[in-house]
Amino acid sequence: TKAAQDENDVVPGLESAARFVNLAGLAKVPGKNLELVAVLNGPATSAALGDDAYLKRHQRTNPNRKLIAALNEAGVDVMVCGQALAHKGFSTTEVANDVTVAVAALTVLAKYQSAGYALIPN
């Protein structure tokens, strides 16, 4: 996933997921018919960090936290790639409680696509 162009902005992939949820609502798609998973990896990995860890590394609170909480409330499962966490030197204990740590983004994508989910890249 791409990182935000400005460190004060949210990750574009999370914005896309929120847009999808909002458009589905406008189209009157029942929430029970939506099953969305957002996977953070690569440059967007730090978006998964809790505020304390993000503050320690970026000297500011995480601008993605409110959107991740809203996505969770809408039923979106927000995940982060465990391989990307390790590569970037982040501990799984630094990840926010409402973000699931996956073994790898590649395995998540393969699993969900084989189950019929559509990949919507950002």
Q: Which role fits each region the language model picked out?
A:
Residues 10, 49-51, 91:
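Short, solvent-exposed loop/turn and secondary-structure capping segments
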Residues 1-33:
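N-terminal secretory signal peptides
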Residues 24-28, 47, 52, 78:
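Amphipathic alpha-helical interaction segments
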Residues 54-55, 59-122:
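A cross-taxonomic marker for long C-terminal extensions/tails that follow the last structured domain
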Residues 1-2, 39-43, 82-84, 122:
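Active-site-proximal beta-strand/loop segments in catalytic clefts of secreted hydrolases
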Residues 1-6, 47-53:
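Acidic/histidine-rich, surface-exposed loop or edge segments in extracytoplasmic proteins
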Residues 31-48:
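Acidic helix-start/capping segments at beta-turn-to-alpha-helix junctions
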Residues 27-34, 69-75:
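Phosphate-binding glycine-rich loops and adjacent basic patches that engage nucleotide phosphates
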